[in-house]
């Protein structure tokens, strides 16, 4: 699924079938007006670097930021974040939960990709960046460095919010979706098809998708040249060798 169509919502349970990449959070000076001036209720994804750094093995250290056009810190303080243990079906407290999950698709540079940008069949070509609660408590903008392959092309496939935030985001974005199950208090297993006929769960899933779709329309992604990196590929065109 591509970012401008939908957002995944099921990352608190059993969906870790992708490779977690080596990502480091960077203290990058965010002095670009396009980065700092995020329109209210929009979500900003930026490729910051005018000179991505190449190290050994054709890996590129590319600099990015993700920013929210609304202050989420107070809400983060007030939610008791939990995850569902699928073995015991009980909720477990999480001290520093993942709030945002960014998924990247990697393709060969010469690979033709259809407009819907289907996920690579090779799961090692799918990678994620996780933004934690602790990183968003003091700033609505988080920057990070991600290692990319210079001989590949990348697409930002989706940005997912923690499902316990969906009722809050429902109000924040004036979606007015109906949640029979309060996900803030009772996160569920979106992967569990055994309860597919349960009307409350079915309606809650439909509402979650409705909220996610509304949020997706508010995501703006550009690079340092003003190119759209949501509908198009992330380009590594100013790579310098690491000293």
Swiss-Prot record:
Q: Which domain of life is it from?
A: Bacteria
Protein's name according to its UniProt entry: Uncharacterized protein UU144
């Amino acid at each position: 699924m591509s970012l401008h169509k939908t957002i995944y919502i099921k990352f608190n349970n059993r969906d870790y079938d992708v490779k977690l990449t080596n990502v480091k959070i960077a203290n990058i000076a965010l002095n670009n007006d396009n980065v700092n001036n995020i329109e209210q209720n929009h979500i900003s994804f930026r490729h910051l670097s005018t000179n991505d750094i190449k190290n050994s093995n054709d890996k590129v250290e590319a600099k990015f930021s993700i920013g929210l056009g609304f202050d989420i810190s107070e809400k983060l303080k007030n939610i008791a974040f939990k995850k569902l243990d699928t073995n015991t079906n009980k909720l477990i407290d999480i001290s520093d939960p993942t709030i945002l999950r960014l998924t990247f698709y990697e393709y060969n540079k010469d690979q033709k990709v259809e407009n819907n940008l289907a996920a690579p069949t090779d799961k090692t070509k799918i990678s994620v960046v996780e933004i934690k609660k602790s990183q968003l408590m003091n700033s609505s903008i988080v920057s990070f460095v991600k290692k990319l392959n210079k001989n590949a092309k990348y697409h930002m496939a989706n940005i997912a919010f923690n499902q316990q935030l969906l009722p809050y985001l429902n109000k924040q974005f004036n979606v007015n979706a109906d949640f029979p199950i309060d996900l803030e208090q009772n996160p569920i297993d979106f992967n569990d098809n055994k309860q597919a006929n349960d009307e409350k769960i079915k309606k809650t899933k439909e509402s979650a998708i409705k909220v996610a779709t509304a949020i997706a329309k508010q995501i703006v992604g550009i690079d340092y040249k003003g190119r759209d990196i949501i509908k198009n590929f992330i380009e590594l065109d100013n790579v310098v060798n690491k000293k």
